[in-house]
Amino acid sequence: MIQKNWQELIKPNKVDFITHGSRTHATVVAEPLERGFGLTLGNALRRVLLSSLRGAAVTAVQIDGVLHEFSSIPGVREDVTDIVLNIKEIAIRMEGEGPKRMVVRKEGPGVVTAGDIQTVGDVEILNPEHVICTLDEGAEIRMEFTVNTGKGYVPADRNRAEDAPIGLIPVDSLYSPVRKVSYKIENTREGQVLDYDKLTLNIETNGSVTGEDAVAYAARILQDQLSIFVNFEEPQKEAPQEQVAELAFNPALLKKVDELELSVRSANCLKTDNIVYIGDLIQKTEAEMLRTPNFGRKSLNEIKEVLASMGLHLGMEIPAWPPENIEDLAKRYEDQY
């Protein structure tokens, strides 16, 4: 009875994932949902997508010749504050755990981009075209980045280590791989009911995870968090006893002829004539058997003797043979022959 509380609620019969040909944008459409569930699920998924998925980000930077973020660098058009803001926008995918180090060194004139950064094996820059700073003629810059993994948003002051060396500038870290999430609720029809909910989620990521995977991870987080509130065991359905259908013939006919103790010559003749089961064999007449190539009286007498020991003989008529599911029936009744 209690299971009707959740079993009789309508669930989406389909969830469509539309990628728009991009790894960073996706649309997820789920319908139909009970009235009100579009808002409930949409809001919950949005909050988890933005706050709880793990990713990688720069946590600190050290620039040669710079002691603090309010400095300026000769020959560099941006001041350090602007450079730090640009560093925050570097999109990173890291397979392992941190912290890891990345280095960039470049001479002017030219633009320093995220693609100029030298990374270690399991760290990948996802937006290599992103501009970090601009160098004039004769200018040179060297920066070392600290990269770590985490979730959500961590302000710079929490990234500041007590034993940090002078010149190490902490950076605000946006670990979440999801940049934007929006959703809308519309009415949809199911049968004669016109006011079920249709949930449409629009997701933008930094490319380290697809929108489809991001939704799956968020749903798994919600599932795991909500499971603690379930204080009962799932009611068990009584498994219906399997009904074994009555056969219209002797189960022994489902036995394969290669299980009979026949001579090699007789067995090969039956195989040549495509006789697989005893049910195939006993429907043959003696005359038909003797027309089989290389099949003689000796083989015929041998088969007649084996069949007689089973209460069978050649030339029998079997209604409904062969059955459609003969292989399944043979496995089911193998203990009876």
Curated annotation (Swiss-Prot):
Q: Which reaction does it catalyse?
A: RNA(n) + a ribonucleoside 5'-triphosphate = RNA(n+1) + diphosphate
GO process annotations (BP): DNA-templated transcription
Enzyme kind, highest EC tier:
transferase
* SMART domains hit by this protein: RPOLD
Recorded GO molecular functions are: DNA binding; DNA-directed RNA polymerase activity; protein dimerization activity
> Which Pfam families does this UniProt record tie to the protein?
RNA_pol_A_bac (PF01000), RNA_pol_A_CTD (PF03118), RNA_pol_L (PF01193)
Name a single GO cellular component.
cytoplasm
Q: Which cysteines are joined by disulfide bonds?
A: none
Q: What is its EC number?
A: 2.7.7.6
Region listing for Alpha C-terminal domain (alpha-CTD), in residue ranges: 249-337
Q: Which residues form a coiled coil?
A: none
The annotated region (Alpha N-terminal domain (alpha-NTD)) lies at: 1-233
Q: What is known of its domains?
A: The N-terminal domain is essential for RNAP assembly and basal transcription, whereas the C-terminal domain is involved in interaction with transcriptional regulators and with upstream promoter elements.
According to the record's subunit comment, the protein's assembly and interactions are: Homodimer. The RNAP catalytic core consists of 2 alpha, 1 beta, 1 beta' and 1 omega subunit. When a sigma factor is associated with the core the holoenzyme is formed, which can initiate transcription.
Q: What family does the entry list?
A: Belongs to the RNA polymerase alpha chain family.
Q: Can you say what this protein is called?
A: DNA-directed RNA polymerase subunit alpha
